[in-house]
């Protein structure tokens, strides 16, 4: 493809936008990749679109290699499908709902499980048509409450979403593994430093999921990993090793103490001279059918909201009871709660269940119990893992300690099972003539977010440093004083054509600009290789070559320039 800057729309700017916090957002605006239209809405300019298409091409190649079939579904979806699946209300305010002129309800698709399941139930009748995997690369819309960080968290974005259909769970798991491997190939080919981590299934649903996290200090997600094994999980899903051994026998007698004004674990620890990890805290959440449930944790631990909302009987999404509801149900404020004589059901975190001689609220304002013991003083009841892990916990596989890193989620894969096929009655007949619900998987990649994540991993003070597969151009050809020198123009023309004929994507900066301006722009937009032709270089038969990653330039023979790239 022939491309000179005079024929291209190079929209670089020096100023950093006031609302751009992340380096990726700043550089995408300054490099002329994006322009903001409204909150969370961006126009991709020609330079940015070239990068976006490079990422989409890699995704498409690997999806095709894995046997997936490309299709394209409507962005606008009928409300009736989402009502069938139960997500019309459950999805929340991020689902942009609209009405047409006939007062029919629709939404802008944030994802396409309902649409693809509708296609499957109409088109798939027999097990002989399986397995199948469909994918699309298409614009999505989610009405984010606070769009920020450019295309890292925008309302409109480009996404690859795929959906597999199998007869049974074994087939679904095989499809999942195939997509998992395809995702590894995609992000490896794109040159990204990433981790595949266990993840919560969120609003999509299903029983099993992995996220693909690009490691970056500015990432919104916390990636938890073992320093001695392959274990890795999003902090929402991460677990520590279960407590080992039996609870020791009680030592002291339970005693009620007055604690006027004490409302927190820290205040109780100071008042009673106990360690926070020797106390429990009690949180009240809403259960199914307007009931209340207490969640009990060790005093120094924090509740993992995602784990909690998946507990049997707990409302999804998680909702905390307010003080009025707590007082009506229990008779005291939130700072005086505890499991002893608690009139509502409770679930105990497995670490709290190991405590001996612990302290807790007495369910009476300004009073607490000390030296409380499970079974002796209060039945233990249900036990579950509901706490957030902390750095230094033992890995759940018993190998190493848990460490934390920041990550940007760029992809996620799900085993859905029959979550959608059962609700929408998508079935096929098996080899015995029996009707079976389709077993589904779904697999998403944020194509536009991947571009931003790559910049977060690959930039310096001068601009973007593109991984080779994502670069908008492979080589920047920069002449010095070309408009004053016929020799320089002629040498540029010759080399430009040689590079194009050899299959390289070249951007020839043929502007009437000072060399420093051209060098700065080429560094800003991140082209991996730069060639500089000048009168002095031609006198010596050389071209100046500089890799974007390198601080130093080197001279190469004009006759052997192509050998640099082989």
Swiss-Prot record:
Reactions performed catalytically: tRNA(Pro) + L-proline + ATP = L-prolyl-tRNA(Pro) + AMP + diphosphate
Keyword Coiled coil found: no
Coiled coil: none
Location within or outside the cell: Cytoplasm
EC number(s) given by UniProt: 6.1.1.15
Keyword Ligase listed: yes
An annotated GO BP: prolyl-tRNA aminoacylation
GO cellular component: cytosol
Pfam families, alphabetized: HGTP_anticodon, tRNA-synt_2b, tRNA_edit
Keywords noted in UniProt: Aminoacyl-tRNA synthetase, ATP-binding, Cytoplasm, Ligase, Nucleotide-binding, Protein biosynthesis
Record-level Gene Ontology MF annotations: aminoacyl-tRNA deacylase activity; ATP binding; proline-tRNA ligase activity
HAMAP family membership: Pro_tRNA_synth_type1
Family: Belongs to the class-II aminoacyl-tRNA synthetase family. ProS type 1 subfamily.
Summary of the function given for this chain in its UniProt record: Catalyzes the attachment of proline to tRNA(Pro) in a two-step reaction: proline is first activated by ATP to form Pro-AMP and then transferred to the acceptor end of tRNA(Pro). As ProRS can inadvertently accommodate and process non-cognate amino acids such as alanine and cysteine, to avoid such errors it has two additional distinct editing activities against alanine. One activity is designated as 'pretransfer' editing and involves the tRNA(Pro)-independent hydrolysis of activated Ala-AMP.
Subunit structure, as described in the record: Homodimer.
Domain comment, as recorded: Consists of three domains: the N-terminal catalytic domain, the editing domain and the C-terminal anticodon-binding domain.
UniProt name for this protein: Proline--tRNA ligase
Native source species: Coxiella burnetii (strain RSA 493 / Nine Mile phase I)
Taxonomic classification: Bacteria, Pseudomonadati, Pseudomonadota, Gammaproteobacteria, Legionellales
Underlying gene: proS
